[in-house]
């Protein structure tokens, strides 16, 4: 089964996640099919906390990909910034 989940990156005590489409059998940080964006839980000030390609996200959902609970919650509350909306 294909899933949409967070792949951890960053340094020790400084998490940074990529939102990826991957086969469920792959490891959390292993090979993935497509990168849909990122999530920075420690974003401060003007830093972007979440960037997500909603067109690609919705396309994968239509194809049958299952989002994780955390990704589903992030996508539900996602509002693109003005830069992303005009691009």
Swiss-Prot record:
It comes from Psychrobacter sp. (strain PRwf-1). InterPro entries: Ribosomal_bS16, Ribosomal_bS16_CS, Ribosomal_bS16_dom_sf. This is Small ribosomal subunit protein bS16. Keywords: Ribonucleoprotein, Ribosomal protein. It comes from the Bacteria. GO terms for cellular component: cytoplasm; small ribosomal subunit. One of its GO terms (biological process) is translation. Pfam families: Ribosomal_S16 (PF00886). SUPFAM superfamilies: Ribosomal protein S16. One of its GO terms (molecular function) is structural constituent of ribosome. The keyword S-adenosyl-L-methionine does not apply. Gene3D superfamilies: 3.30.1320.10.
